[in-house]
UniProtKB/Swiss-Prot annotation:
Chain segments carrying region Disordered: 1-21
Signal sequence residues: none
GO cellular component, one term: nucleus
Name this polypeptide is given: Coiled-coil domain-containing protein 89
Subunit structure of this chain's protein: Interacts with HEY1.
Chain segments annotated as coiled-coil in the UniProt record: 36-346
Annotated InterPro entries: CCDC89-like
Keyword Signal in record: no
Subcellular location(s) per record: Cytoplasm; Nucleus
Keywords, alphabetical: Coiled coil, Cytoplasm, Nucleus, Phosphoprotein
Amino acid sequence: MPQEEKTLRMDTPPPDEILGKQNENLQNQDEELGFKEMDGLREALANLRGLSEEEKGEKAMLRSRIQEQSQLICILKRRSDEALERCQILELLNSELEEKRLQEMEKLKAQSEHIQKLENHFMILASNHEQMIRFKDAHKSENVKLKEENARLRQENNSLFSQALKDQEAKVLELTTLNKALVEELEVLKQRCAHEASQAQAREEELLGLQNQQACDHAKETEELRSQLQSIKQQHQQATEQMGKEQEANLNLNQELQARLQTVLREKEELLQLSMERGKVLQNKQAEIRQLEEKLETAAMAKKHALERFEQEAVAVDSNLRVRELQRRVDGIQKAYDELRLQSEAFKKHSLDLLSKERELNAKLRHLFP
């Protein structure tokens, strides 16, 4: 298991490398946006060169609004990317905490197995102690039996020597010598039994002392291991509670960040859609402005030609009917020119209304994302 965890850690890239790649992607995207903005500015400057001062001012105002909106969109995108990076870092931290928890669980399991082995060893020592006690009791009972047999033999010897065997007087000397030999042998046996009994008692006392010492040592070791196990259990419980709190806090933070990220992405999509729609509207309005300008130029040229023709025809022909017709044509051209001028003023008013709405929307967005 530790080798597999090491290989997994080696396979997963560090958070610094991930952040570096994301920063490179963000820089590339910012450069692309900067290039696109420069192209748009060049086109806008090319269009502004053929416009009047008033229209140049309006175009500059529109261009500043569009640039401000694009900057705001870039800010929102950068903040959403930062929120996404925070989420990824939190996920990495959660995975590291999970690995630490698994390692602590494995350590606790190994300690529990070690404690179980020590308890089994203690039980084996207890059974050996009981066997030694039974061996000591059996040795004591055997010693008692030997003492009883020795007393019986003494009694039999006394009964045999006390009897008067008149018909076996010839064997008295032999029995006397045999009795002496038996007595000597009995003394040797007594000394041997006493020596063996003292050795057995000393060995028994030594074994009892050693067993008591081992029992005390094992009891102390068991008590220490139990106290260590209790402290380890308390530490594991505290670590588990702390990890649970941290996981709960991380989960709440992840949920909050996900909600804010979804809101930012949705507002970003809405702003992009709105900017695209406004771009289309501006393009349409610019086309209408160009058409109106062309119509105005055509009307001005027609008015100029009509006035010239009117002057020429007024000089050439002094007829009231011709003068009325020319005057009617001049009035028609003037009316068309007035209508075109009214349409141009209405379009300017509509453009100013759109700009004011855009300023309000930008102010609301700045208030939402300070």
